[in-house]
A protein has these predicted regions:
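Glycine-rich phosphate/diphosphate-binding loop of Rossmann-like nucleotide-binding domains
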Residues: 2-41
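Glycine/charged-rich beta-loop-alpha catalytic/anionic-binding loops adjacent to active sites
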Residues: 3, 30-31, 80-81, 102-110
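N-terminal beta-loop-helix "entrance" segment that forms/cooperates
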Residues: 34-56
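Glycine-rich phosphate/pyrophosphate-binding loop and the adjoining helix
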Residues: 129-168
């Protein structure tokens, strides 16, 4: 099986966040790879990865970084493969990473999710892959239906909570 999604993180300290995307891709039966690459510490490896991704069959790249979060943009600057950026909460409550990822110059887009939003990055990657793939669209629909059922159940449980002035 050849991976179609790459999950890239600045270091393995990002794994607790990024494993949410990995678990979703596993659940959706999408082959993926994971690498630790740093725009600042391993720039040659980042360049080789980015320039070779399309040729290796990668369709979507999920890249995560904290602090001076240049990894996502550097990768996006060297490939035509869509890049989804995940800002990692570190210094400044992740705002530095968020702004570094979202404020890309014209022509070098990085789709950006919320701080530590690896699950949404995984979902977005699946949605990109599902264009023209009815089986994957069905899996996404089932996933979202399951989310709906969880909220309906939670709402029913909330109805049982009692307070003196709660009217429902």
């Amino acid at each position: 099986m050849t991976p179609v999604v790459s999950i890239i993180m600045g270091s393995t300290s990002d794994l607790p966040v990024m494993e949410k995307a990995a678990k979703l891709l596993d659940e959706m039966e999408i082959p993926f790879e994971m690498h630790a690459l740093s725009a600042h510490r391993t720039p040659a490896e980042v360049e080789a990865f980015a320039k070779g991704a399309k040729g290796r069959g990668i369709k979507v790249i999920i890249a995560a970084a904290g602090m001076a979060a240049h990894l996502c943009g550097v990768i996006a600057s060297m490939t035509t493969v869509p890049v989804i950026g995940v800002p990692i909460n570190s210094t400044l409550d992740g705002m530095d990473a968020l702004l570094a990822i979202v404020q890309m110059p014209p022509g070098i887009p990085v789709a950006t999710v919320g701080i530590n939003g690896a699950l949404n990055a995984g979902i977005l990657a699946v949605q990109m892959l599902a264009v023209g793939d009815e089986q994957l669209q069905d899996k996404l629909a089932a996933y979202k239906e399951d989310l709906k059922k969880k909220i309906v159940k939670a709402n029913k449980e909330l109805a049982k909570v009692s307070f003196k002035y709660k009217m429902n």
